[in-house]
A protein has these predicted regions:
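Active-site loop segments of alpha/beta catalytic cores
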Residues: 1-63, 82, 90
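Catalytic-face loop-and-helix region of soluble metabolic enzyme cores
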Residues: 46-156
């Protein structure tokens, strides 16, 4: 057990973000589970990547943090494509519909759904290194197809 405060984590993230930004880059982070999403935003992260397939509802618990992220040009990277055998049960349409439900939940907290869509990146829920080549290829194909489908729905 390590006792680390929220302020400690935010300070460390801000230090890293400042270094990344000083080089002209953006800082992104991935969380495989649930977390207090505002810590990442308060820490200066530009791209918050999360497992939206299993934990997508949790981001709606932090609408103020998402507003802050969007206001400074940041993005949510929605890991809506499962990086597990569940990918065999999904299609681009089912995953786009899943994203729509999650975006609707976030929009119900007062965010503009069009802005949510504009500042979204579609990703896998986690890495694919432990999966078969076939499942990995399916995952990356579904990322592209789901993204294209949502771009078409939103006109960009």
């Amino acid at each position: 057990y390590v006792s680390v405060t929220r302020d400690d984590v935010v300070a460390i993230l801000n230090e890293m973000a400042e270094a990344v930004h000083a080089e002209g880059a953006v800082m992104g982070t991935h969380c495989c589970g649930n977390t207090e999403w505002s810590i990442l935003v308060d820490g200066g992260v530009d791209i918050v990547n999360f497992d939206a397939y299993e934990y997508g509802e949790t981001i709606a618990m932090y609408p103020d943090a998402v507003r802050t992220l969007f206001a400074r040009g940041g993005c949510l990277a929605w890991g809506v494509v499962p990086s597990s055998a569940k990918v065999r049960e999904e299609s681009a349409a089912s995953l786009a519909d899943r994203w729509e439900r999650l975006a609707d939940l976030l929009a119900s907290k007062g965010l503009d759904k069009a802005e949510i869509a504009r500042q979204a990146i579609i990703t896998s829920s986690c890495g694919t290194g432990s999966l078969s080549v076939e499942d990995s290829e399916r995952i990356f194909g579904l990322i592209a197809e789901t993204s294209a489908l949502l771009k078409k729905r939103y006109g960009f």
